[in-house]
UniProtKB/Swiss-Prot annotation:
Residues 96-192, 222-319 form the PH domain. PANTHER family: PLECKSTRIN HOMOLOGY DOMAIN-CONTAINING FAMILY N MEMBER 1 (PTHR46882:SF1). Controls the stability of the leptin mRNA harboring an AU-rich element (ARE) in its 3' UTR, in cooperation with the RNA stabilizer ELAVL1. Decreases the stability of the leptin mRNA by antagonizing the function of ELAVL1 by inducing its atypical recruitment from the nucleus to the cytosol. Binds to cardiolipin (CL), phosphatidic acid (PA), phosphatidylinositol 4-phosphate (PtdIns(4)P) and phosphatidylserine (PS). Promotes apoptosis by enhancing BAX-BAK hetero-oligomerization via interaction with BID in colon cancer cells. Residues 360-391 have a biased composition (Polar residues). It is found in: Cell membrane; Mitochondrion; Mitochondrion membrane. This is Pleckstrin homology domain-containing family N member 1. Residues 341-350, 498-509 have a biased composition (Low complexity). Residues 1-45, 323-424, 438-468, 483-611 are annotated as: Disordered. SUPFAM superfamilies: PH domain-like. Phosphorylation is essential for its mitochondrial localization and regulates its interaction with C1QBP.
């Protein structure tokens, strides 16, 4: 019929009047939009279609007088909860007990958000609007909450802990508002039969039996505890912490306003203590592990530092943990072997045959003149076949070492020394004593093919930090003073440390009975060497099995500061820092040992062979 553009069109403002009936589509949209509004009489008249809608509660303005507007607070609280994949409306939460606008802040966060906080008979609802446009809302059951006021804070605030990712801090505008919130929260929680306030919590256990976040108690009582500063490298911040040493673990706590807060636990079998670091600080040591960042511990005083070293050495020795690295560099320390070779700083090699040897003048330079390894009695009952086989094995080792000594570089020697002792893949209960001796703090570095052990087969996974707190800290000061006054555990090793303040005596004057420890001076060294020449070489006596403990000298190859003896018999570090004299003289002065007769069968076959 032609183009439609040829038909005259009515003006745009009059075009709507030509339609025969209004559009029904717009009316449907308007009615559906009105039915999804706020809950009230209009929503109730919408029928079944409005009942299936999901509503969100939007809090209004601040309510000045709750008594006058009580009828408005009894409206149902509608929200959305997920039940599987479908969403269902929530039941009515009841009347609003208290309502106010406060500020919300999570612990360890500086962001403060305006929050609408509403208290229902059994729930606490909050909706916070962040500065970046984010909205935080949550519905918390009162039976799972713990409310604690912040006494030492300048702000009128209280803390809420419960099923939250972090404790929640509620900042009130005034002290009166804070008191009202605490009153209503405590009242509603008491009506529900749940936990009340922090001060009415059940009493905690003693400080020596602290529970950790993993839910188990550390084995045994606390061995050592003190206030230290912890630095998580490579960060530079230092934190005040309470470090507690148990027989099998290290526990870390922080002193908060409401008590002690658990921070973490480190099993001693998964970490090792490093006493030698490049940037060594005074009174500090490192806690290292394969799955943690290195932690630097800075003690408060020299006495505290020495007490920690004594306790750590005793506990690691008792538990069979790796020895303290760098322990042999301290004056008076001993090195124990198990039938293996060790390299001294002078490039010499010593082979221990499993029994004790008299002191020699060719002691490693890593020890000062005033300290030598002590002697401990051992049996020498062996058959001639065993003696011949041991001598043959020693000869083969000496030949192999001569062949490979010229081709080995100092770096390879250092790598050979850096390997730890070999531990069997299956622990034998009958060999626990020998394993504890081999892994003691006085043991040297051994060359081995594999350094894996069942102690490290299961890597350490730090437990999730929970909100376990110790609120009753009335005995904390007494507990710390008792830990400081205690001298620490006595090492269970049959090889005690050698004191450095006892005068030197003639080794030949020792009897088979108990006697005091002795030290080696220049004169004693010459006498012992003459006695060694008089008795002959080690081939005249039956050597001991290679797995028996033996005291030899050991030092790290390429040490930047070798322990060369000075004219006054002190080490270079001692001359620089006189505090070490007092520390180690006091630490190692309580050792007692047995000195066998040099002419007896105990020492007849235990001579150290030098190449």
């Amino acid at each position: 019929m032609g183009n439609s553009h040829c038909v005259p069109q009515a003006p745009r403002r009059l075009r709507a009047s030509f339609s025969r009936k209004p559009s029904l589509k717009g009316n449907r949209e308007d009615s559906a939009r009105m039915s999804a509004g706020l809950p009230g009489p209009e929503a109730a008249r919408s029928g079944d279609a409005a009942a299936n809608k999901l509503f969100h509660y939007i809090p209004g303005t601040d309510i000045l007088d709750l008594e006058n507007q009580r009828e408005n607070l009894e409206q149902p609280f509608l929200s959305v909860f997920k039940k599987g994949r479908r969403r269902v409306p929530v039941r009515n939460l009841g009347k609003v007990v208290h309502y106010a606008k406060v500020q919300l802040r999570f612990q360890h966060s500086q962001d403060v958000s305006d929050c609408y906080l509403e208290l229902f008979p059994a729930h606490l609802y909050f909706q916070a609007h962040g500065s970046e446009g984010l909205t935080f809302q949550g519905l918390l059951p009162l039976t799972e909450l713990s409310v604690c006021p912040l006494e030492g804070s300048r702000e009128h605030a209280f803390q809420i802990t419960g099923p939250l990712p972090a404790p929640l801090l509620v900042l009130c505008p005034s002290r009166a508002e804070l008191d009202r919130w605490l009153y209503h929260l405590e009242k509603q929680t008491a009506l529900l039969g749940g936990p009340r306030r922090c001060h009415s919590a059940p009493p905690q256990r003693r400080l020596t039996r602290l529970r950790t976040a993993s839910g188990h108690e550390p084995g045994g009582s606390a061995v050592c505890a003190s206030r230290v500063k912890l630095q998580h490298l490579p960060a530079q911040e230092q934190w005040d912490r309470l470090l507690v040493l148990y027989p099998t673990s290290l526990a870390i706590f922080s002193e908060e306003l409401d008590g002690l807060c658990f921070k973490g636990e480190l099993p001693l079998r998964a970490v090792h203590i490093n006493l030698e670091e490049k940037e060594k600080q005074i009174r500090s040591f490192l806690i290292e592990g394969p799955l943690i960042n290195t932690i630097r511990v800075v003690c408060a005083s020299y006495e505290d530092y020495g007490h920690w070293l004594l306790c750590l050495r005793a506990v690691t020795h008792r538990e069979g943990a790796p020895p303290l690295p760098g322990a042999e560099s301290f004056p008076g320390s001993q090195v124990m072997g198990s039938g293996r070779g060790s390299l001294s700083s002078g490039g010499q090699t010593s082979w221990d045959s499993g029994c004790l040897a008299p002191p020699s003048t060719r002691t490693s330079h890593s020890l000062p003149e005033s300290s030598v390894p002590s002697t401990v009695g051992c049996s020498s009952q062996h058959t001639p076949d065993q003696a011949n086989s041991d001598r043959a094995s020693i000869g083969r080792r000496r030949t192999e070492l001569r062949r490979s000594g010229s081709s080995r570089s100092p770096g390879s020697k250092a790598r050979a020394e850096g390997r730890g002792p070999v531990t069997p893949l299956h622990l034998d209960l009958t060999q626990l004593h020998r394993l504890s001796l081999e892994s003691s703090p006085d043991a040297p570095d051994h060359t081995s093919e594999t350094s894996h052990s069942p102690l490290y087969a299961d890597p350490y996974t730090p437990p999730a930090t929970s909100h376990r707190r110790v609120t009753d800290v009335r005995g904390l000061e007494e507990f710390l003073s008792a830990m400081q006054s205690a001298r620490g555990p006595t090492p269970s090793s049959p090889l005690p440390s050698v004191p450095v303040s006892v005068p030197a005596s003639d080794p030949r004057s020792c009897s088979s009975g108990p006697a005091g420890p002795y030290l080696l001076s220049k004169k004693g060294a010459l006498q012992s060497r003459a006695a060694q020449r008089h008795r002959g070489s080690a081939k005249d006596g039956g050597p001991q099995p290679p797995d028996a403990p033996q005291l030899v000298s050991s030092a790290r190859e390429g040490s930047p500061e070798p322990w060369l003896p000075l004219t006054d018999g002190r080490s270079p570090r001692r001359s620089r820092d006189p505090g070490y004299d007092h520390l180690w003289d006091e630490t190692l002065s309580s050792s007692h040992q047995k000195c066998p007769q040099l002419g007896g069968p105990e020492a007849s076959g235990g001579l150290v062979q030098w190449i």
